[in-house]
Curated annotation (Swiss-Prot):
It comes from Bordetella bronchiseptica (strain ATCC BAA-588 / NCTC 13252 / RB50) (Alcaligenes bronchisepticus). Its main location: cytoplasm. Catalyzes the ferrous insertion into protoporphyrin IX. It catalyses: heme b + 2 H(+) = protoporphyrin IX + Fe(2+). Belongs to the ferrochelatase family. Pfam families: Ferrochelatase. This is Ferrochelatase. Keywords: Cytoplasm, Heme biosynthesis, Iron, Lyase, Metal-binding, Porphyrin biosynthesis. It is an enzyme of class 4 (lyase). Its EC number is 4.98.1.1. One of its GO terms (biological process) is heme biosynthetic process.
Length: 362
């Protein structure tokens, strides 16, 4: 308290001795073309596949009240007393099994997406700085915003890389970006992409990914579209996620020319004991095998970059469940990652959202 009062009474003591720019300069240098920033944001990942790194990541992730919507006084003892004591040990070998030479697949592919958008915008004459951030872990949202501000960006477009909107994903990115920007004295103008589940650029890229896979490997008896699950109460409270998932699935089915009975829409990654969106992916795959379906392909349209949930949960655990129940051929169709049609589509989406801002475009 006394320190704050001291700073208030003698603020000059805490100012830089030689400010980078005189704030009272009547003729400040003109701002360069990098006045617009694009912030791509994905979920996050541990820094390395070790128990300690996973514990730090889960601690931040599962402490978010948007993710775990139960009273803090009930949840925090469970988180620190049970979850963080047990889950890292179980998850460490699973992360190690998918780790790439460059690092976590989610981070590697997200970095490539950011680089692709940066190059794509520049090729179109759009002057914008592009940074990648993770909602949990590194690179952090505050660090990315700071980097954009240091390059003169006073307009920032935040793009949560979640096609379907959910409060536990998209909204918490909005929370984090506005919270950090709100602490700045010179705040940037902000825009957010709420969702792109039905955006033609996204749908075309995702459908093209599936069609390209089939052209190389042939079509299966059944296509399973597996989306990340949510507790049912989230939908009952007004979250549009379930509707977004069904819209995406319908658009992809129509674009691929499939009948309704050739596609199954399921939900994965259930956590805890609450009832989640159904049908669940793994039991559905086992039931399909028991019904005589011997060939399935699984695609995860809610993930634009491969990660633990796709490379381990779907490609390995769900494969084992399908084969154990009598299935013969199980194939996972990779996420969009850094495939050129998706980089082009994401660049299109970003360019459209930047209209009206000083990007150098007419």
């Amino acid at each position: 308290m006394f320190l704050r009062l001291f700073k208030y009474l003698w603020p000059e003591r805490y100012l830089p001795e030689t400010p980078a720019q005189d704030p009272f300069d009547e003729n400040p240098p003109p701002c360069g073309p990098g006045r617009v920033g694009v912030l791509l944001v994905n979920l996050g990942t541990p820094d390395e596949p070790t128990r300690g790194a996973i514990r730090r990541y889960l601690g931040e992730f599962l402490s978010d009240p948007r993710v775990i919507e139960i009273p803090r006084y009930l949840w925090m003892p469970i988180l620190h007393g049970l979850v963080l004591a047990m889950r890292p040990k179980k998850l460490a070998p699973r992360y190690a099994g998918i780790w790439m030479e460059e690092g976590s697949p989610l981070l590697v592919y997200s970095q490539r997406q950011a680089a692709g958008v940066r190059q794509g915008l520049a090729a179109r004459g759009v002057h914008a700085e592009v940074e990648l951030a993770m909602r949990y872990g590194k690179p952090s949202i505050p660090a990315a915003i700071t980097a954009l501000r240091e390059r003169g960006c006073d307009h920032i477009l935040a793009v949560p890389l979640y096609p379907q909107y959910a409060a536990s994903t998209t909204a918490t990115v909005v929370d984090a970006v506005t919270r950090h920007a709100g602490r700045l004295r010179d705040q940037p103008a902000l825009r957010f992409v709420k969702r792109f589940h039905n955006d033609p650029a996204y749908v075309e890229a995702q459908a093209g990914r599936i069609a390209e896979f089939w052209q190389a490997h042939g079509r299966p008896q059944k296509l399973v579209m597996s989306f990340h699950g949510l507790p049912r109460y989230s939908i009952e409270l007004g979250d549009p996620y379930y509707r977004d998932c069904l819209d995406t699935a319908r658009l992809l089915r129509e674009r691929l020319g499939l009948r309704e009975d050739e596609v199954e829409v399921t939900f994965q990654s259930r956590f805890g004991s609450a009832r989640w969106l159904e049908p669940y992916t793994e039991p559905t795959l086992a039931e399909l095998a028991r019904q005589g379906v011997t060939e399935v392909d699984v695609v995860c349209p809610g993930f634009v970059a491969d990660c633990l949930e796709t490379l381990e949960e779907i490609s390995q655990e769900c494969r084992d469940a399908f084969v154990a129940a009598g299935g013969r051929q199980f194939r996972y169709i990779p996420a969009l990652n850094d495939c050129p049609p998706w980089i082009e589509g994401l660049t299109d989406l970003v360019e459209r959202q930047l209209r009206g801002w000083p990007t150098g475009n007419p």
